[in-house]
Amino acid sequence: MQRASSIPARFALSIFGRSNRVLLPAQVAKLKTLALLHASQLVTLAGPKRARVGKELSELAIIRDGGMLIRDGIIESVGLSGEIEKNARDAEIIDARDRVVLSGFVDAHTHLVFAGDRLDDFERRAKGESYEQIAAAGGGIWSTVEKTRAAKDVDLFAQAKRRADWFLKCGTTTVEAKSGYGLTVEDELKILRVIRRLNTETPIEFVPTFLGAHAIPEEFRSAPEQYVALVIHEMLPRVVEEQLAESCDIFCERGYFDIEQSRKILTAAKKLGLKLRMHVDQLTNSGGAKLAAELGATTADHLEKTDEQGIAAMKAAGVQPVLLPGSVYALGSTCYPRAREMIDAGLAVIVATDFNPGSSPTPSMAMVLSLACTQMKMSPAEALTASTINAAHSLTRGEKIGSLETGKLANFAIFDCEDYRELAYWFGVPQVHSVYVHGKRVF
């Protein structure tokens, strides 16, 4: 058997450094067969063929001294290393000794494509201004919209591709990505086309979501219903015609889109065949969780202000909650979603980064795991399930990613630790050793 060449030493540089170059699959020699052996913990997450609820969130199906046989980018078998090695005579060996191996993270809520940054907003928050105060003064979403509208396609793609590399270096292999910083027909399409291009020019799979109803643009402030009509009658048909999105999202919140406006837009999107995702109850308990249940949304995201009635409505309708503790942390708030109550109620909880320039500028799922444990009192196992297989099911990809099981894509990350709990425990430490997509090493 041939042994793969050694991989750079632990924690060589920051995950944002240039010591470990991200490679596209086409740049990596095709590996017909791989045998990953001797993982300290192979976190398979094998289990029900659906999103996990209740106690299932804690059942990781760990194999100690675990291994996988991978052929043509697909997991052929999973088990003890001794058994895997018997069938790996011609395989290239990946020695995962003293390391944790798990499915690549699945980030189910991001705003990846935008121009510039929000450093001024960050400094103003540090001085005590609220998110709403900053937005009212011309900052917030609108400042990013102006920069994104002004950016050329090529520049927008270059910035997004750089950020995509950050996700990969954090062990994330699938990313839901929203539009929402254009707020005109052509600028929203521009963002979604960038997301489509990212799918062809990076190793990550991006799942596109249309978020034209992210905010009322300045030019429609005095006539918000006209903008609602623009989204329904001009944006949505173009998005569907070009097959640029799988889902439609909306920011249902005070000062953005109210319940009735949200209902109109999402009903139109559903009629056009798009799945529904929603930003709800982030700043106020607006009844957004109940609307998500009424409309049969796939997910309801944020939920910081959701009450017991909202939780019950989501449970009854099978809506998956996507919890975003990174945005609570970055905004300096202490009002985290009621994760424990949602888990105890039987909801298939997800955690995600909410990566965006204003309220959660992090691509690190490990940081989110830490916040989920320390601030929302989820166990490390629950947080891990919520960031992999549950997230995959919310993107209708649970049958092919999110766990390490026979027949699934060989999308996985190897971490420089011996116990999966270290991912949440050592916050701020870059523990990603290597990342594989379709059985090819891409970092």
Regions found by a protein language model. Give the residues of each.
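Metal-coordinating catalytic core of metallo-dependent amide/deamination hydrolases
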Residues: 139-161, 165-166, 173-286
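Active-site-adjacent C-terminal substructures of enzyme catalytic domains
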Residues: 275-276, 285-403, 415-421, 427-429, ...
